[in-house]
Design a protein with these regions (language model features):
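Start-transfer (signal-anchor) and selected internal transmembrane alpha helices
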Residues: 1-39, 125-133
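Perimembrane helix-loop-helix junctions
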Residues: 15, 216-245, 273-275
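Transmembrane signal-anchor helices characteristic of membrane glycosylation enzymes that use polyprenol
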Residues: 20-52, 108-110, 135-144, 203, ...
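Short hydrophobic/aromatic helix or loop-helix immediately within or flanking a transmembrane segment
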Residues: 56-64, 68-98
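Transmembrane-helix motifs of polytopic, lipid-linked glycan transferases
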Residues: 99-125, 175
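Membrane-interface micro-motifs in multi-pass membrane enzymes
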Residues: 129-181, 341-350
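Membrane-interface alpha helices of multi-pass inner-membrane proteins
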Residues: 193-210, 216
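Transmembrane helical bundles and short interhelical boundary loops of multi-pass, membrane-embedded
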Residues: 247-252, 256-407
Length: 407
């Protein structure tokens, strides 16, 4: 993992990294196990609720297996279910769907921990397993700062619990983002192993759910053009082969299948319209407050560390990607099934990655603060915002687990 995600502030070139120790391997395993035990348990129960997204996608997977008919252009979840069923790793399509979701939760936790370890493994304070485990848990658990009984549109969520394709997307989004950072902010030649992982992360994310890639691709393109104009170092070959070509090919195909009106190869057909606040305004009021409560930590950190944050390439890309995600959800809608609010997944996925990037950036700033300094007050404000997100997430998980216990 280290060779895939290694990067530094100024130049994301791969440093020489040791193998992770037993404590870090154990901590990553604990993060994955704890996350799957909580969120996996919630998802496991949701597979028994008739008519929700979990059941619908399992039915589409079975239809794909038996008839070859593709229901939606993002069909990776269905393919994985069918592969598990065909290989006799799951006795039913339902069990296959559950296992894929559990695996995606575990992989997301391991990837977040792995990124943090790559960055901080040389720091005696922040590179310890308990610290990285706590940081990983905070990123995974964080939710909008509100006391809610269940998922509701209006806030922006790191994990809305209710859609398996979004759960599958998140590890691909994390991998795709940090690999893009690695090649966008340094000039180097990618070996075939790293490039293959990059392609798989991008293609897998698009086929799981294209919501994140339609944000990352334009953001990365803008940053790349600006760096070319400024003659700043980047890796154009790796970016083109790992991100640009597979992303454009898959996204173009998905658009033609679902939105062009020219092909009937998939069951899902619709259009895209310019419709500011049509969706979010329909479901919620007080959108400005809900936005701020959903993004308090990612907002507080760059505001309080503005001089450093505005020059940090990772933060630039993360925020620009989230900007596109927010624009999609607040300004666009589908023309027919607009009430499905499918553009929310762009905002949710880009916010999740923004939380991860902000955690990396913030911990770097914490590591640089002298032990006795008034600057710790600034870090306490950031910690307070993060703690509020985490507490809200824990309370939300508690509510969901209580629902699971009652049913």
């Amino acid at each position: 993992m280290a060779r895939f995600f290694a990067f530094t502030d100024a130049d994301p070139a791969m440093p020489s990294l040791p193998r992770p120790g037993v404590s870090h391997i154990a901590a990553a395993a604990v993060a994955a196990a704890a996350y799957t035990c909580v969120h996996g348990a919630i998802a496991w129960k949701l597979f028994q609720v008739h008519g929700n997204d979990y059941i619908v996608h399992v039915k589409w997977a079975e239809d794909l297996y038996r008839t070859g008919r593709i229901a939606v252009p993002h069909f990776l979840y269905h393919l994985l279910i069918d592969a598990m069923y065909a290989a006799h790793l799951a006795s039913s399509f339902l069990l296959g769907g559950r296992l894929v979701v559990i695996g995606a939760y575990a992989l997301a936790a391991v990837l977040i921990y792995g990124v943090l370890w790559v960055v901080f493994q040389g720091d005696r304070r922040l590179g310890r397993a308990p610290v990285l485990l706590a940081a990983t848990g905070a990123v995974l658990v964080a939710q909008p700062i509100a006391r809610l009984g269940w998922y509701t549109i209006g806030y922006l969520w790191n994990d809305p619990y209710n859609t398996p394709t979004f759960t599958l997307l998140r590890p691909f989004a994390v991998a795709g983002f940090f690999l893009t950072v690695r090649f966008l902010y340094g000039r180097r030649r990618a070996d075939w192993g790293v490039l293959l992982v990059f392609v798989l992360a991008v293609a897998g994310g698009a086929l799981a759910k294209p919501s994140y890639l339609i944000c990352l691709l334009p953001a990365a393109a803008i940053v790349a053009v600006l760096r070319i104009l400024r003659r700043a170092p980047l890796s154009p070959g790796a970016l083109l082969m790992g991100l640009g070509l597979p992303a454009l090919a898959i996204l173009a195909g998905q658009y033609l299948l679902a939105y062009s009106g020219r092909f009937g190869a998939v069951g899902y057909r619709d259009g895209i319209a310019w419709a500011p606040l049509r969706v979010m305004g329909h479901y919620a009021s007080g959108l400005v407050a809900k936005f701020l409560l959903s993004t308090a930590f990612p907002l507080a950190v760059p505001i309080l560390h503005w001089k450093t944050a505005r020059r940090d390439g990772m933060m630039q890309l993360a925020w620009l990607t989230f900007f596109f995600g927010a624009c999609y959800v607040y300004l666009l809608s589908e023309t027919v099934q607009w009430a499905a609010a499918n553009f929310v997944w762009s905002a949710y996925s880009s916010l999740f990655v923004l939380f991860a990037a902000t955690m990396v950036f913030w911990l770097r700033q914490v590591a640089a603060v002298p032990v006795r300094s008034w600057l710790w007050l600034r870090e306490l404000v950031c910690f307070g915002a993060l703690a509020a997100h985490v507490i809200a997430g824990v309370l939300m998980d508690k509510t969901c687990l209580e629902w699971v216990a009652r049913h």
